Amino acid sequence: MTPATRAGERPLRILAISGSLRARSSNTSLLRLAVDVAPDDVEIVMYDGLATLPHFNPDDDVDVPPAPVAALRAQVGEADGLLFCSPEYAHGVPGSLKNALDWLVASLELPHKPVALLNASPWATHAQASLVETLTVMSTRIIHEACVTIPVARGDVDADGAIESAEIRQGVRAALDTFAGAIRSRTATRP
């Protein structure tokens, strides 16, 4: 029996956010794999609204923000943790992901939220560091032990965007186990 099934507890809910808008993105494929290999007591939900967010404008960040922004904030608020996987463009994160984070800066949903980062490319170190810096400034709780690089080559992703490599599957599952354990530990120690 898993911890989430004891005494009617709900599974941990993790929101997975890909920094890529590409249809066959290795980053999105890695997050979809996380959905497939997640422990039974962990529910991973893919965020699919990145392309629908308007460009961030503080003048539009009002009591009733644009609907896609409100939806993003609601999903972040409902999540026990956030799982990011992003490509690197010009030594940084893609503008679409940074835009989403900008919409979360003034919201109350993000501070102290546990975060883990998957990196699908061993060469995307600048984006990973940039994302860590941005999320740290935004007062998230980065679980460094669950932040891992799991190289995904083009040949690892099939025509449907699935990854079947046992090694990659095991790496993602290990990161999720670490992340879920850290979230539960944090929840158990709250006053």
Language-model regions, residue ranges each:
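N-terminal beta-loop-helix "entrance" segment that forms/cooperates
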Residues: 49-66, 156-158
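Helix-loop-strand module that forms the ligand-binding subsite of alpha/beta enzymes
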Residues: 64-139
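A generic structural motif
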Residues: 38-45, 141-142
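Glycine-rich phosphate/pyrophosphate-binding loop and the adjoining helix
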Residues: 2-15, 141-191
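N-terminal beta1-alpha1 ligand-phosphate binding loop
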Residues: 6-41
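A general structural signal for well-ordered alpha-helical segments in protein cores
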Residues: 14, 27-31, 69, 94-97, ...
